[in-house]
């Protein structure tokens, strides 16, 4: 634990167990001597998601420690998300000795294989024990584990077989804490390299765009290291100023309100066919694709060049198979782009300037009509929450959106408000599991946070309420209760021959959320109007720890409202 701390470890999540007792004792000692941030969690699945939230906010790997057996299998959902979202996390799992494998020994499974498909690396420690290897081998193992988690960020699994006795005596613990080391143990620190070693990133193969022709910039959800964000924003600003291209930015893109050429209602402009694609339109795509079917159709009808830039993400990120990908980051690509056009000045292209001006005007018209539908009515709906919520919360408080409906509604209806603060969502695998735990992890590092989630996402991760975090400031859970998976009401489902949408898809649950909150000693309110929501937010910001605000909505009415807005835009602008 000390060795990891020297490389930058700041947060540990500890799960209970006997086989992992030596690791738990080490964490306890580290808390006393260094004040490292350590948290406990009885549910390994929730623990792992919380750790991902911390890592997403900090940019550094959080370590999760578990015992052997099924405890390790519970790490898989979070490991999948960390892999797809490129977030560093280290799982340290205690294991039974090799001699107990394959012979029916209790709580002994092939746990070293559980996380292999999604981990950057799986390290199996020598069966002789860590105390029997040389100092150089020991520190090489620590170095490689930390390095693999950060070079191409993602999960790393360190599996440690531990022999009995598992529980050191008081005197043995004291001796270790006072600096005991194995004989001939040379303590060294090896330098860390965080440069990706992936040979598939070939900077010579640089896809090009023509700044003299029309185009748009499409910024998807931000997927990069926190240290890369400032440079990314500067590069976006510079490219947009060179070309005059409009910028369609996802609410999760981390683009700021200061960015020129920003089109906030682009998803509605596309879905209402107010802005349509054509053969001449080029697209600079930044990061993963936004969750919009209208956008996918739009891109399929764009037959010109599409270039996809990722911030070190080495896998191909275009499910449409239309774009040429460059994985070396926007700053790197922009340098090459500028060298190919040395005489390029700001806003050279008049056609693109005209396109931008037209879109800015239409964007304003869309906003006006959306406000007529959503802002002038005090009734709580899912689209109106997306439109109004951010104006009720101080701009220094970040927001997390759960998967499913919230992230889609904020993409469509929130306007410019998301670009005044950071919005988070975990879109790697886009599951509804772990949302509360992820939010808790974010809030541990970021401070006060608001998470918007549906009732099924909330109930799916209700074990997160056992984490009892954060301690000193509020985590406001805005629970949109639409009586099940409301997103299924938005799908074009054919009439069901036997059964019902509720029974087979939406699956409403008869859980009293107020009683659940009371059981966990969590403050709770139900609201039915935006005046009540505003009052509840003011109340919750004065509290510490999780706070639940429940807003009841009607998914069928909200589905019709979304359709009416899109249809109304077609008539209003076209």
UniProtKB/Swiss-Prot annotation:
Q: Which cofactor does it need?
A: Mg(2+); Mn(2+); thiamine diphosphate
Superkingdom of origin: Bacteria
**SUPFAM superfamilies under this entry?**
Thiamin diphosphate-binding fold (THDP-binding)
Q: How is the cofactor bound?
A: Binds 1 thiamine pyrophosphate per subunit.
Q: Which GO terms describe its molecular function?
A: 2-succinyl-5-enolpyruvyl-6-hydroxy-3-cyclohexene-1-carboxylic-acid synthase activity; magnesium ion binding; manganese ion binding; thiamine pyrophosphate binding
Q: What class of enzyme is it?
A: transferase
Known catalysed reaction(s)? isochorismate + 2-oxoglutarate + H(+) = 5-enolpyruvoyl-6-hydroxy-2-succinyl-cyclohex-3-ene-1-carboxylate + CO2
Please state the Enzyme Commission number of this protein. Answer: 2.2.1.9
Q: Which UniProt keywords apply?
A: Magnesium, Manganese, Metal-binding, Thiamine pyrophosphate, Transferase
Which example biological process does GO assign this protein? phylloquinone biosynthetic process
Signal peptide residues are: none
* Pathway field: Quinol/quinone metabolism; 1,4-dihydroxy-2-naphthoate biosynthesis; 1,4-dihydroxy-2-naphthoate from chorismate: step 2/7; Cofactor biosynthesis; phylloquinone biosynthesis
Mention any Pfam family matching this sequence.
TPP_enzyme_C
Name the NCBIfam families on file: menD (TIGR00173)
| Described function | Catalyzes the thiamine diphosphate-dependent decarboxylation of 2-oxoglutarate and the subsequent addition of the resulting succinic semialdehyde-thiamine pyrophosphate anion to isochorismate to yield 2-succinyl-5-enolpyruvyl-6-hydroxy-3-cyclohexene-1-carboxylate (SEPHCHC).
How this chain assembles, per its entry, is:
Homodimer.
So what family is this one in? Belongs to the TPP enzyme family. MenD subfamily.
> Any idea what this protein is called?
2-succinyl-5-enolpyruvyl-6-hydroxy-3-cyclohexene-1-carboxylate synthase
Origin organism of this chain? Prochlorococcus marinus (strain SARG / CCMP1375 / SS120)
Name of the gene: menD
């Amino acid at each position: 634990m000390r060795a990891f701390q020297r490389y930058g470890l700041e947060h540990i999540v500890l799960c209970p167990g006997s086989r992992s007792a030596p690791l738990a004792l080490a964490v306890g000692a580290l808390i006393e001597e260094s004040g490292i941030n350590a948290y406990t969690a009885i549910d390994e699945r929730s623990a792992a998601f919380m750790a991902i939230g911390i890592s997403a906010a900090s940019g550094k790997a959080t370590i999760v420690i578990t015992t052997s057996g099924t405890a390790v299998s519970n790490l898989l959902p979070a490991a999948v998300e960390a892999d797809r979202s490129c977030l560093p996390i280290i799982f340290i799992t205690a294991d039974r000795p090799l001699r107990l494998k394959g012979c029916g020994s209790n709580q002994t499974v092939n746990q070293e294989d559980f996380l292999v498909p999604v981990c950057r690396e799986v390290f199996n420690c020598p069966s002789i024990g860590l105390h029997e290897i040389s100092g150089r081998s020991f520190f090489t193992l620590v170095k490689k584990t930390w390095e693999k988690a950060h070079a191409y960020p993602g999960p790393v699994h360190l599996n440690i077989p531990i022999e009995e006795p598992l529980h050191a005596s008081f005197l043995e613990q004291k001796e270790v804490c006072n600096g005991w080391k194995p004989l001939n143990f040379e303590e060294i620190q090896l330098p860390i390299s965080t440069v990706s070693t992936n040979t598939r990133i070939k900077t010579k193969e640089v896809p090009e765009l023509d700044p003299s022709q029309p185009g748009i910039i499409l910024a998807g959800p931000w997927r990069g290291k926190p240290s890369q964000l400032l440079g990314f924003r500067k590069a976006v600003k510079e490219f947009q100023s060179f070309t005059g291209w409009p910028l369609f930015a996802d609410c999760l893109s981390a683009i700021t309100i200061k960015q020129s050429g920003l089109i906030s209602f682009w998803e509605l402009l596309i879905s209402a066919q107010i802005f349509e694609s054509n053969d001449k339109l080029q697209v600079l795509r930044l990061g993963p694709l936004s969750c919009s079917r209208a956008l996918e159709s739009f891109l399929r009808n764009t037959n010109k060049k599409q270039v996809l830039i990722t911030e070190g993400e080495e896998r191909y990120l275009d499910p449409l198979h239309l774009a040429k990908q460059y994985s070396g980051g926007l700053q790197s690509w922009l340098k090459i782009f500028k060298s190919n056009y040395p005489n390029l000045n700001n806003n050279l292209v008049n056609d693109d300037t005209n396109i931008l001006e037209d879109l800015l005007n239409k964007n304003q018209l869309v906003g006006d009509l959306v406000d007529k539908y959503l802002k002038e009515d005090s009734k709580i709906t899912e689209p109106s929450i997306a439109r109004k919520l951010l104006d009720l919360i101080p701009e220094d408080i970040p927001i997390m959106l759960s998967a499913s409906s919230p992230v889609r509604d904020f993409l469509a209806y929130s306007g410019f408000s998301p670009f005044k603060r950071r919005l988070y969502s975990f879109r790697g695998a886009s599951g509804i599991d772990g949302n509360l735990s992820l939010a808790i992890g974010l809030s541990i590092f970021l401070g006060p946070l608001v998470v918007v989630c549906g009732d099924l996402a909330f109930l799916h991760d209700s074990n997160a309420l056992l984490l009892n975090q954060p301690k000193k400031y509020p985590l406001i859970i805005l629970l949109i209760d639409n009586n099940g998976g409301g997103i299924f009401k938005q799908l074009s489902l054919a009439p069901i021959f036997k059964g019902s949408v509720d029974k087979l898809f939406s699956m409403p649950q008869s859980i009293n959320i107020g009683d659940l909150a009371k059981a966990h000693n969590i403050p709770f309110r139900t609201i039915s109007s935006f005046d009540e929501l505003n009052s509840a937010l003011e109340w919750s910001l004065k509290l510490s720890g999780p706070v639940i605000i429940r807003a009841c909505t009607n998914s069928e009415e909200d589905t019709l409202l979304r359709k009416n807005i899109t249809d109304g835009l077609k008539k209003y602008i076209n």
